[in-house]
Each structure stands twice: as structure tokens, then as C-alpha cells.
């Protein structure tokens, strides 16, 4: 069953943003907050349909405004999808952070964070695909802390907690890339029907990345 999506959003998209929980079927629009309401409605719409079937006019209808009003904030559909993708990436990081903190020790936290990544993809497939299909000026993993979404910050933090203290930045980057490739590839295999949504199998695969 698809979980209700709590997402993190404001114009700056930093890790200090508040999590906003909005019912997926009826996001509410409050005067003066049209941009955030549009992102919420867009997230809800992606729970029901693919990115290809996403329509800006449907978002406007759901929040009770004209398409013209939305165009004042988003010049086209791609601009709105970009804002939704940014919110999704930060929310993914928040899910991973929560999983890591609940786990305790660094190695267990790494595994649980990876499981949370794959689980997010399975629970929100259209959003997950959008997040990583949206064009970016630079690779997400290379983005400065706080600008590429807290998902990448969380990944780098988890890697730093269990690699050797004297590891070079390049070594840590290679470890982070390897971990990301594993969980992202696993998520895509499940979404594309190439491997079953088997929680035990997913956990075993991710544990293989843990040293020792």
C-alpha cells in the first residue's frame, strides 16, 4: 500500500525545512502559499499517474485556481516538475535520516538507510523516477552539502561513519558512489519488475556492502 507522503518544501530547499504532511487526494491551498500548494498537489498527482500523464492544468484544478495563476509561479510544466523533484529528493533524505537514527550503530544505520532508499522508490515510483530523471546542472553526488538534497548528504554522512578516518576524499566519494549505485540499481530492478519486492532479499543485498 502506498504510504502518505510527507514532503519537505520551501523556496530554499535546505535540510532545515519543515516536513509538511498533506492528504494525497485533497491538498489544501491557502492564500499566499500557491507555490507550495502546487507542489503538494503535484506530489499527490504523481501517486496516481506517471510523469508522462502529469498535467499542470490538473494540478490547478485540484487546488482550485486557474492554470494562468500557476503560470505566474511556474513558467511551464517542467518548472513545476523540477520543484516537485527537489521536494522528493529532500523527503527521500529525511526518510533515510529517520531510518539511520533508529538503527543506532553506524553499520546498521547504513543498511537501514539503504533499505529506506529502496522502500521509498517502491512506495512512490513515479516520484522516484522523476527525481533522478530531472536535469541538473551538475551530478547530484558532487553537489555542495545542502544543495543536492539531504538524500546525498545522508549518504555521505553514512559513508564517513564507517570508512577509515584517514581515507581520502576520493576514497570516500568512491565508497559513496558504490553504495548509491547498489541501492539505486536495486530500486530500479524492483520497479522494472526484474526482481521481486522481497524485503528480506533487499536487506541481504544491501548488507553485502557492509565491511566484515
Predicted regions and their residues:
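N-terminal intrinsically disordered/low-complexity leader segments
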Residues: 1-33, 44, 103
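Short secondary-structure transition hinges
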Residues: 119-157, 165, 188, 192
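Hydrophobic alpha-helical connector segments
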Residues: 83, 97-127, 152, 176-179
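Generic hydrophobic, amphipathic alpha-helix propensity
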Residues: 34-42, 59, 84-88, 92, ...
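Amphipathic alpha-helical packing segments from all-alpha helical-bundle domains
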Residues: 139-165, 170-177, 200-211
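Helix-turn-helix
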Residues: 37, 45-79, 83
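Amphipathic C-terminal alpha-helical segment
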Residues: 161, 180-197, 211-212
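Amphipathic alpha-helical linker/stalk segments
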Residues: 26, 86-110, 142-150
Amino acid at each position: 500500500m502506498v504510504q502518505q507522503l510527507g514532503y519537505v518544501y520551501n523556496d530554499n530547499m535546505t535540510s532545515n525545512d519543515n516536513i509538511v504532511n498533506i492528504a494525497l487526494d485533497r491538498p489544501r491551498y491557502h492564500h499566499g502559499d500557491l507555490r507550495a500548494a502546487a507542489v503538494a498537489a503535484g506530489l499527490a498527482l504523481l501517486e496516481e499517474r506517471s510523469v508522462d500523464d502529469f498535467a499542470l492544468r490538473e494540478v490547478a484544478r485540484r487546488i482550485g485556481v486557474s492554470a494562468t495563476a500557476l503560470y505566474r509561479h511556474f513558467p511551464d510544466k517542467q518548472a513545476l516538475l523540477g520543484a516537485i523533484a527537489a521536494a522528493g529528493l529532500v523527503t527521500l533524505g529525511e526518510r533515510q535520516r529517520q531510518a539511520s537514527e533508529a538503527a543506532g550503530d553506524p553499520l546498521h544505520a547504513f543498511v537501514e538507510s539503504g533499505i529506506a532508499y529502496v522502500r521509498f522508490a517502491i512506495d512512490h515510483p513515479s516520484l522516484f523516477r522523476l527525481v533522478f530523471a530531472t536535469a541538473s546542472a551538475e551530478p547530484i553526488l558532487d553537489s555542495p552539502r545542502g544543495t543536492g538534497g539531504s538524500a546525498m548528504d545522508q549518504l555521505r554522512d553514512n559513508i564517513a561513519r564507517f570508512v577509515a578516518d584517514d581515507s581520502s576524499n576520493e576514497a570516500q566519494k568512491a565508497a559513496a558512489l558504490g553504495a548509491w549505485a547498489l541501492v539505486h540499481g536495486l530500486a530500479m530492478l524492483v520497479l522494472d519488475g526484474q526482481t521481486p519486492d522481497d524485503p528480506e532479499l533487499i536487506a541481504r543485498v544491501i548488507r553485502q556492502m557492509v565491511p566484515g
